[in-house]
Amino acid sequence: MEMKNMVVGLFLIAAFALPALATNFEKDFITHETVQAILKKVGPSSNGMLDEQTISALTGKTIISNPVLEEALLTHSNSINALGGTLPCGESCVWIPCISSVVGCSCKSKVCYKNSLA
């Protein structure tokens, strides 16, 4: 009986802890430089006001500035993108689409890449 209680307890812990843990690992991010590029591109045409959808998307992403994380993403993008492999937009698109589409980026393999034709 004691073993059964331990197994049930383990399943209860897993049921509540694992979904919260998974959401921390798959959060979208955006770099400070990308936010600045978006604001520079959008700002003058709209008198400094962003639309509600853009504000919601920006607040849903985690701003990063860690050079180690950026270097890891650059290394990872080299293996995915055989045509260039640079860190083009500094943004992920796991859950939220590329906000940097304003500056010519699109989503590929959960990372926003710059369209070379734009």
From Swiss-Prot:
There is a cross-link at G85-N115 (Cyclopeptide (Gly-Asn)). InterPro entries: Cyclotide (IPR005535), Cyclotide_bracelet_CS (IPR012323), Cyclotide_sf (IPR036146). Residues 1-22 form the signal peptide. Keywords: Disulfide bond, Knottin, Plant defense, Signal. The keyword Signal applies. It holds the Pfam family Cyclotide. The presence of a 'disulfide through disulfide knot' structurally defines this protein as a knottin. Probably participates in a plant defense mechanism. This is Cycloviolacin-O8.
